[in-house]
Amino acid sequence: YDVYGLGEFPISYWYTVEPWSYTNADGSYNDELTKARYQEMKDSGINIAMYYGHAINRSITEQKRLLGILEQIGMKFIGSASGAHVEIPTAEQIAEIKEHLAPSSAYLGDLVRDEPGAHEFDGLGAYVDEFHRQMPDKDVYINLFPAYANAATQLKSANYEEHIDQYIEKVDTKALSYDYYGLMANGSVTNTYYTNLDLVRSKTLDV
């Protein structure tokens, strides 16, 4: 389970607290308030900050600012230099990550895509291979669809099992991530939640 070498189970979130969420009266960043919010996350058991969500500026400069805060409180960081709903990142973006973000002790890798279809797996796989070639100790984070996604319009695969098989075959990330909205407000759990979990677990154990 410890795919990132943390010495503990990796726990993160989706939407983030951006470095510019808190400002002083003159408009400058209030890093102490930002640090306090991330300290609360760490105290709750979260050990990886995921830089995604309602972010209006994913610049390298902003991410370096947040990395400095995370280094102070002992959290790790998965950035998003390219964003997760755009074209596959370029070689130039890998170079920027390697130069400016990867040297940080808090940096784990880069989030490049949320819920890709299978038609994107070849390109994503090539990007992951190049990322690992340049930074073998870092990783690319990709979040997949859940089992209830539409096969034709979302998965672009015949079925969910084939979708997972195709991803594992073509994209060599350290972790296989997917989202599943399974815990309902009334306390129930949707009927395929554990089926999805069991399928992904069995597939990844075979790798």
Per-region residue spans from a language model:
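Glycan-processing catalytic domains of CAZymes
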Residues: 1-207
